[in-house]
Swiss-Prot record:
Name of the encoding gene: hisA
Keyword Transcription: no
Gene3D superfamilies: Aldolase class I
Name the UniProt record assigns to this protein: 1-(5-phosphoribosyl)-5-[(5-phosphoribosylamino)methylideneamino] imidazole-4-carboxamide isomerase
EC number: 5.3.1.16
Main location: cytoplasm
Catalysed reaction equations from the record: 1-(5-phospho-beta-D-ribosyl)-5-[(5-phospho-beta-D-ribosylamino)methylideneamino]imidazole-4-carboxamide = 5-[(5-phospho-1-deoxy-D-ribulos-1-ylimino)methylamino]-1-(5-phospho-beta-D-ribosyl)imidazole-4-carboxamide
Length: 239
């Protein structure tokens, strides 16, 4: 299992949200690039980056911050937030982003999603952000009427191999991930599943590893020092 430390960027700085609410954001670090470098030094094999302003605006806003992360680290990064057309995907791949996460666009623009998966294959992941079991879009502000499993199956049929599942109610709470949701998703699709939201300690990571989850995104637990990234990576790699 891969542990992906998270960098959420708002107005050029690293922030953490609480249950996906933008008004409840707090700055945890001034420099996304320096934060990424520290994650690399701790042994991170992949870094999860979200352009929060982009998620709201529907276009990449913090491109300079993303570029700076790519320039200072050799660790591959995945990026989500506001990626809505193939030209942006191409641009991001060209500047060195390893994996692109489609969220709102995957739900609202099937033609673009199909084109992106066909063109870039393994470089495209689908982010499913769920609230009470239903897919949320537009920076989590709107909840659709599509069940997360139903949506995951559609995305798998379209050819995606990677799904990132976030339970919005758990995000930033340090109350543990939604293991039941993850298990149900595992039972219904054959994609690589990355867990996001609520991971609070090493025990959560061990349980996810035992479930054969592909990846675990950890944000607040690292910033609040509930999880030591270096130690966690070492423990998970040995299991």
């Amino acid at each position: 299992m891969i542990i992906l430390p998270a960098i959420d960027i708002k107005q050029g700085k690293c922030v953490r949200l609480y249950q996906g609410r933008f008004e409840k954001s707090s700055v945890v670090a001034e420099s996304p690039a320096l934060t990424a470098k520290s994650f690399e030094n701790d042994g991170a094999k992949y870094i999860h980056v979200v352009d929060l302003d982009g998620a709201l605006e529907g276009e990449i806003i913090n491109l300079d911050a993303v570029k700076s992360i790519v320039q200072v680290t050799s660790v591959p990064i995945e990026l989500g937030g506001g990626i809505r057309n193939i030209k942006v995907v191409e641009k991001l791949i060209n500047i060195g982003v390893k994996r692109i996460i489609l969220g709102t666009a995957a739900l609202k623009d099937k033609e673009f999603t199909r084109e992106a998966i066909k063109e870039y294959g393994k470089s495209i992941a689908v982010g499913i952000d769920a609230k009470d079991g239903y897919v949320a879009v537009n920076g989590w502000l709107n909840v659709s009427k599509i069940n997360y499993i139903e949506f995951a199956k559609i995305m798998e049929d379209m050819g995606t191999e990677d799904i990132i599942l976030t339970d919005i109610s758990k995000d930033g709470t340090l109350k543990g991930p939604n293991f039941d949701m993850l298990k149900k998703l595992q039972e219904n699709v054959n994609c690589n599943i990355t867990a996001s939201g609520g991971i609070k300690d090493l025990d959560d990571l061990i349980k996810l590893k035992e479930m054969n989850i592909y990846g675990a995104i950890v944000g607040k637990a690292i910033y609040s020092e509930k999880i030591n990234l270096k130690e966690a990576i070492a423990v998970i790699e040995k299991r």
